[in-house]
Regions:
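Short beta-strand edge segments in extracellular beta-sheet folds
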Residues: 168-172
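Short, compositionally biased P/S/T/A/G/V-rich stretches that sit at domain boundaries
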Residues: 24-92
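Solvent-exposed loop/turn segments flanking beta-strands in beta-repeat/beta-sandwich domains
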Residues: 100-112
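Short edge beta-strand/loop segments characteristic of extracellular beta-sandwich folds
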Residues: 92-101
């Protein structure tokens, strides 16, 4: 009987060691080397900020788009993680889009930008993993290095109005 128990114990130990890892479910939203580079490099030239009409040609916002401060702009709510307190990576993020009036949200205009001395578009790192809907999105396993990270989220509606939300993530 004892050899059978020892064999079962080895089997359970092997299964627990070779089981799925939490690391397999995470992805680098921003790597440590990127955060360092984006926060220390000087841009070669100033970028022009634009309030261009997003209704024209089904255009989408850029990391340098600014809203026209209209109260009727769509809203972006960050439901998780809780902002304003220390966080640990990996992060799960719940983002909700709130349309105004009868204009529907255009999910194809969703944009996430890392804002440092150099601004970088991170959208594809998220949209390759999750689907963005008119209601919002849920991201799991976003890895960020320790430090303070500024993200800018943008979304437009069918009338071309731009919603903008900034988030500061303090990772410890």
């Amino acid at each position: 009987m004892k050899p059978m128990r020892a064999w079962a114990a080895r089997l359970i130990l092997a299964a627990s060691v070779s089981g799925p890892s939490l690391a397999a479910d995470t992805f680098d939203l921003v790597s440590e080397s990127e955060a360092t580079a984006w926060n220390s490099l000087q841009p070669k030239e100033a970028k022009d900020f634009s309030t261009r009409d997003l209704r024209e040609d089904d255009s989408a916002p850029t990391c340098h788009s600014t809203p026209d401060n209209d109260a009727d702009n769509p809203q972006i709510r960050i439901l998780a993680p809780p902002l304003g307190r220390p966080l640990t990576a990996p992060l799960d993020m719940d983002i909700q889009f709130v349309p105004t009036g009868s204009a529907r949200i255009r999910p194809d205009t969703f944009l996430v930008c890392y804002v440092g001395l150099v601004t970088m578009d991170l959208t594809k790192r998220i949209t390759d993993r999750v689907t963005v809907s008119e209601k919002g999105l849920h991201v799991t396993g976003a890895q960020l290095p320790r430090g303070r990270h500024h993200l800018l989220l943008l979304i437009a509606d069918q009338r071309g109005r731009l919603g903008r939300r900034e988030a500061v993530l303090d990772i410890y």
